[in-house]
Amino acid sequence: LDLHRDLLASDLWLFGDGPIDPRGLPRVSLGACGIATFRLTTYGPATSLHSGHYGNVAPNPAARLAHLIASMRADDGRITINGFSADPPSQRSRALAREGFDTEGMLSGPAIAETEAGLSYGESIMRPALNVTQLTYGGAGPQRNAIDSQASAGFDIRLTPGITPQRARELIEAHVRNQGYTLVDAPPTLEQRRSIS
């Protein structure tokens, strides 16, 4: 690519990506959501502990992570992180979004009763989205009576104009701090676990 950069220069990119219209109509959509991904891990005791001996004593990473996720996203899909709202689309853009997609067809195939916010499919994808894509706690197999040492969640954010990946990161980090968490870029040391609640 670097060797032939001049041959690859262009004024426009066309991507063959996106959902197929259930009516079979060809579609050209102008604009696309960007994406940023991140992972949050909450920590508790240094090792797994018996919940009968340490329930209500040791911080429960899974419960804390669940509260943190709930603080970031409303039931209707809106991101509730301060500063994360995008400029609302114009009436014309909203009308085009409603008319440009077969909402009923887009929802019936994957068996979705309604969009999270009750908007049309097109209006829904015009909004920034925070998706929980992975949750990890405990291990595979039968349920255990244990409080484990950490819980983790993977996320993707569908970005809309005006929200860059860097800005999204800044807003998320500020939100996590405002919820009372200390951010670390590696698993906490024993000393950190003993001093940070």
Describe each model-derived feature in a short phrase.
Residues 27-41:
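Flexible glycine-/small-residue-enriched beta->alpha junction loops
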Residues 37-197:
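Metal-dependent amide/peptide-bond hydrolase catalytic core
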Residues 1-31:
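Acidic/histidine-rich catalytic neighborhood of metal-dependent amide-processing enzymes
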